[in-house]
Design a protein with these regions (language model features):
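Active-site environment of divalent metal-dependent phosphoester hydrolases
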Residues: 59-63, 84-86, 122-123, 147-149, ...
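Metallo-beta-lactamase
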Residues: 81-136
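Metal-dependent catalytic neighborhoods of phosphoester/phosphodiester hydrolases
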Residues: 64-73, 89-90, 222-229
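Active-site neighborhood of phospho(di)ester-bond hydrolases with catalytic His/Asp-centered motifs
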Residues: 27-30, 50-58, 78-81, 139-142, ...
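Active-site metal-binding motif and surrounding structural segment of the metallo-beta-lactamase
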Residues: 33-79
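Structured catalytic core of nucleotide-sugar glycosyltransferases
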Residues: 5-15, 58-64, 88, 113-116
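Cap/insert and terminal regions of metallo-dependent hydrolase folds
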Residues: 149-250
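Conserved beta-strand hairpin/beta-sheet module of binuclear metal-dependent hydrolase folds
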Residues: 1-43, 126-143, 160
């Protein structure tokens, strides 16, 4: 049985924990090293059990604590070639640090790892699919302006899907963000709205998804209740019942539970 925990999930900072078969990894390090270590301790997870860190892309809310965390954990960090290049240019990584995701099989992990490209305004951005020995896949898919066919092919068939439900379009359009920022978020390389996220869910559940985690919610342009209602309403309209066909929860900004999946 695998374990998944959204340690941090919001526009302010992101970090996920995934473990299966005796191997444990982190996805992103968008808060301070101290916050990440505290979150692990709260879940009785030893930092020494982490064997790698996977990075989705180089935006600050996904890499803010990475440099210090790597100094503390002494583990490899993996990402796309473009992401690694950007992190070195930002001096978050040294020239010697960073392993291209194409070399992931060189690590002694108890599960497979696949990086898939996402549509986001950051070169080399992507999401991850983890495949344990029993074949029950987990996808982590946030920071995307649209669900492309590449993304859809990657996440269909996953038992557990972490998917972005970033904003309510009405709240964003009527909110205080500057117009250029609103346009960026709404673009095909921005962030996924509640409605766009919900549209994808029936297909995912019919393809075998049983655990849905809505993630990367905006604190300013969304609420957990609104994201949840939007998702469940669309699923219900498609004849899919919560509890019997799927389970769904919203990842909080911090303090998310450990899910046994």
């Amino acid at each position: 049985m695998a374990k998944l925990s959204p340690l941090f999930s919001s526009s302010s900072g992101n970090c996920f924990y995934y473990a299966s078969g005796g191997s444990a990894v982190l996805v992103d390090a968008g808060v301070s090293c101290k916050q990440i270590l505290t979150a692990l301790a709260q879940r009785s997870i030893a930092p020494e059990s982490i064997c790698a860190v996977f990075i989705t892309h180089s935006h600050d809310d996904h890499v803010r604590g990475l440099r210090v965390l790597l100094n503390r954990l002494k583990v490899p960090v993996l990402a796309s070639a473009q992401t690694l290049q950007t992190l070195r240019q930002k001096q978050i990584l040294t020239p010697e640090q960073g392993l291209d995701i194409t070399r992931v099989q060189s690590l002694p992990l108890a599960f497979g790892v696949q990086l898939f490209a996402t549509s986001h305004d950051c070169p080399g951005s992507g999401g991850y699919v983890f495949t344990p020995e029993n074949g029950e896949k987990t996808a982590i898919c946030t920071d995307l302006g649209e669900v492309t066919e590449t993304v859809r092919r990657a996440i269909l068939g996953c038992k557990t899907v972490v998917i972005e439900s970033n904003h309510d379009v009405g709240m964003l359009q009527n909110g205080s963000y500057p117009y250029p920022l609103k346009q960026r978020i709404l673009s095909s390389q921005g962030h996924l709205s509640n409605g766009c996220c919900a549209t994808e869910l029936p297909g995912l559940v019919r393809a075998g998804a049983r655990e849905i985690v809505l993630a990367h919610l905006s604190k300013e342009n969304n609420t957990p209740q609104l994201a949840e209602i939007t998702a469940v309403s669309v699923l219900t309209e498609n004849g899919l019942q919560r509890g019997s066909d799927y389970r769904l929860q919203v990842a909080p900004p911090s303090g998310g539970p450990v899910l046994y999946i």
